[in-house]
């Protein structure tokens, strides 16, 4: 790709099929996931999150792209790195964090932790351990 002044030439830019608004929303979603996971990592290090806490840092674009490609009625089930999926499908960050920290306001009333929460409303059916699940 040739560059002029650090930008791609107009002839090299590809139409993504998404509007500027959709692309901005995708960026905001990726940023939300990154910041959420950074905070979850801090809380885990401080002992506020028990059990395991498998972070989604570095994979934000994957789940946001997946959500952008889904059609009405599609459902998601994932492996143990699932916080990004929860946030990208529209689950409330406060509810997800409440679950991670074992509070009753969490999606599984604080009993599911990092890997075992779900939202029927958002068509998200949880994260599952790798043994025998994949």
Regions found by a protein language model. Give the residues of each.
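Conserved acidic/glycine
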Residues: 1-62, 68
């Amino acid at each position: 790709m040739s560059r002029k002044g650090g930008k791609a030439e107009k002839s090299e830019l590809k139409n993504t099929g998404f509007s500027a608004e959709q692309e901005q929303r995708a960026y905001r979603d990726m940023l939300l996931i990154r910041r959420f996971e950074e905070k979850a990592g801090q809380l885990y290090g401080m002992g506020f999150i028990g059990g395991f806490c498998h972070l989604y840092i570095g994979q934000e674009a994957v789940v946001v792209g997946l959500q952008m490609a889904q059609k009405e009625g599609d459902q998601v089930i994932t492996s143990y790195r699932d916080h990004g999926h929860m946030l990208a499908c529209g689950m409330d960050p406060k509810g997800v964090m409440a679950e991670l920290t074992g509070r009753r306001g969490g999606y599984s009333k604080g009993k599911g932790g990092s890997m075992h929460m779900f939202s029927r409303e958002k068509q998200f059916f949880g994260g599952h351990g790798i043994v025998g699940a994949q």
